[in-house]
């Protein structure tokens, strides 16, 4: 079965993306976290950062007019929504010395394990490479960890996210080098297709 089309997210997609994030957490987190952790994550992790859409670094997959997967990358300092509002969150990263961030990956429960997460990660890698980045980092919740490992991310450390309501959620800091292009410039053509 072919993947549903991927495109860059736009501001009018925000309500549908937020709904998908919330539903994905409620669907998938109970397999990894308890009821309190799932409920807290639905409030504080399933939160769309509009800066990703404004920066044109956030992708969606649509099937039958509905967004079924979303995720992206950032060239800014903020690593994840739950990281709080630090003074330098919006700072642009230096691609020569700092890694790009993979951000806010969510797949609707009935669309998991069909390649959508991988397709978004591939789009993120192409776009970050085109901007000169050499590495990707992310803060994974436990439901996403298997996808990231399968894509070649390695664990840096395990850590605890403390939500604003005091609930703690186990997470994993991960990284992956961005592979250099081998021959031709197919990557720039692929990146151009992602933005169409």
Indicate residue ranges for each PLM-predicted region:
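A short beta-loop-alpha structural element at the N-terminal edge
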Residues: 5-19
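Small/polar loops that bind or transfer phosphate-bearing groups
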Residues: 9, 103, 139-140
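Conserved GNAT-fold acetyl-CoA-binding loop/helix
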Residues: 25-47
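Short loop/turn motifs at secondary-structure junctions and domain boundaries
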Residues: 49-55
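Conserved acyl-donor/pantetheine-binding loop and adjacent beta-alpha core of acyl/acetyltransferases
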Residues: 55, 62-64, 68-112, 127, ...
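Conserved acetyl-CoA pyrophosphate-binding loop and the N-cap/start of the following alpha-helix
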Residues: 111, 115-123
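Conserved GNAT acetyl-CoA-binding A-motif
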Residues: 121, 128-141
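C-terminal "cap" of GNAT-fold acetyltransferases
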Residues: 134, 141-145, 151, 158-196
């Amino acid at each position: 079965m072919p993947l549903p089309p991927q495109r860059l997210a736009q501001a009018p997609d925000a309500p549908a993306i937020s709904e998908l994030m919330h539903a994905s957490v409620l669907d998938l987190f109970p397999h990894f976290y308890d009821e309190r952790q799932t409920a807290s994550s639905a409030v504080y992790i399933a939160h769309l950062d509009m800066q990703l859409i404004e920066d044109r670094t956030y992708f969606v997959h649509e099937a039958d007019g509905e967004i079924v997967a979303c995720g992206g990358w950032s060239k800014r300092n903020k690593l994840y929504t739950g990281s709080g509002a630090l003074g330098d969150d919006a700072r642009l990263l230096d691609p020569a010395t700092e890694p790009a961030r993979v951000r806010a990956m969510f797949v609707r429960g009935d669309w998991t394990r069909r390649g959508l997460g991988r397709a978004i990660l591939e789009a993120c890698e192409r776009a970050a490479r085109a901007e000169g980045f050499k590495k990707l980092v992310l803060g994974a919740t436990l439901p996403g960890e298997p996808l990231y490992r399968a894509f070649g991310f390695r664990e840096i450390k395990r850590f605890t996210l403390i939500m604003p309501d005091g609930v703690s959620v186990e997470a994993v800091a991960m990284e992956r080098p961005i592979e250099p292009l081998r021959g031709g410039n197919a990557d720039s053509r692929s990146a151009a297709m992602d933005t169409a």
